[in-house]
Amino acid sequence: MIDTSIPLVDLHRHLDGNVRVNTIWELGHQHGIALPADSLETLAPFVQIQGKETSLVAFLKKLDWMVGVLADLDAVKRVAYENVADAALSGLDYAELRFSPYYMAMNHKLPIEGVVEAVVDGVKAGLKDYNVKINLIGILSRSFGQAACTQELEGLLAHKQHLVAMDLAGDEMGFPGELFNDHFKRVRDADLAITAHAGEAAGSQSMWQAIQELGATRIGHGVNAIHDPKLMEYLAKHRIGIESCPTSNLHTSTVASYAEHPFRTFMDAGVLINLNTDDPGVSAIDINHEYRIAKAELKLTDAELAQVQRNGVEMAFLSDSDRKALYAAKV
């Protein structure tokens, strides 16, 4: 099902959405943070999706517990390190870990730039111990408004040499992309690539805006593109990558069922699309799960899954030489 001759990548993976249950438990007790359960076993349902529960509100509450225990910068560094370990242990050859330093900092009033430094340090430490290639993507969390995103941008740009791209995430309906055009001009001026969560809660116009005004060359989720034939044609022609996360889309009620997921529609239209985990800690999945779902529920053939793997390598924010090195390591 997964072709071992092709690099396995995960490009849409939130570092702050992948905190281990035992880490939440340990950090909560270490810092005297009240947790919603009195044992490690009973904590899991509060921080991970159980069964077929599908609600955006419930999903976000679980996500909040993951950042709620980041009481100091050592905790941030630990979580970053464990993200590298988890990526390697799931069999990934390459992952792009994205994170929102404002969101990670807000509960315990940590310095935003300090959070960025701690993430970088944790990833560096992880790379010494695990054989996986990692790049970082900074997130501007639109839900907190323009001023907060400016603070976030400043903290991220102070360490731009450790980033490959910037992302816009959060409340797509309440905070449309045009509010952040100036922010992303600065991102482009810093020579960073751009991806954006768009077409998830809002319609195709949100995707057009992200591409034409923010400068996005990849789109996170993008499920609503299928209602706009001109956009689908544009995506295919210009090789705009769709970072698809089927299980997450089900868990957040972005789609009602796997049967209604538009992954197949994108593939049939010739759109560049790959498989990703989104918030693997909340969804309690790994990349292997997404490939199993793609075969069993989305009805992709092994040949199509191999193409999805190749798409991921093409979409990655990598130099041509790094891309070739990923393939060379599989020989």
Curated annotation (Swiss-Prot):
Instruction: Please give the cofactor(s) recorded in the UniProt entry for this protein.
Output: Zn(2+)
Q: Does the keyword NAD apply?
A: no
A Pfam family hit: A_deaminase
Source domain of life: Bacteria
Keywords noted in UniProt? Hydrolase, Metal-binding, Nucleotide metabolism, Zinc
Q: Name one GO cellular component term.
A: cytosol
State the active site. Answer: 200
Q: Where is this site: Important for catalytic activity?
A: 221
For binding Zn(2+), which residues are annotated in this chain's numbering? 12, 14, 197, 278
Annotated GO biological process: adenosine catabolic process; hypoxanthine salvage; inosine biosynthetic process; nucleotide metabolic process; purine ribonucleoside monophosphate biosynthetic process
Which positions bind substrate?
14, 16, 170, 279
Q: Which reaction does it catalyse?
A: adenosine + H2O + H(+) = inosine + NH4(+); 2'-deoxyadenosine + H2O + H(+) = 2'-deoxyinosine + NH4(+)
Record note on cofactor: Binds 1 zinc ion per subunit.
What EC numbers are recorded for this enzyme? 3.5.4.4
Q: Which GO terms describe its molecular function?
A: 2'-deoxyadenosine deaminase activity; adenosine deaminase activity; zinc ion binding
Family designation: Belongs to the metallo-dependent hydrolases superfamily. Adenosine and AMP deaminases family. Adenosine deaminase subfamily.
Q: What does this protein do?
A: Catalyzes the hydrolytic deamination of adenosine and 2-deoxyadenosine.
Q: What HAMAP family does this protein's entry cite?
A: A_deaminase
Q: Give the protein name, as stated in the record.
A: Adenosine deaminase
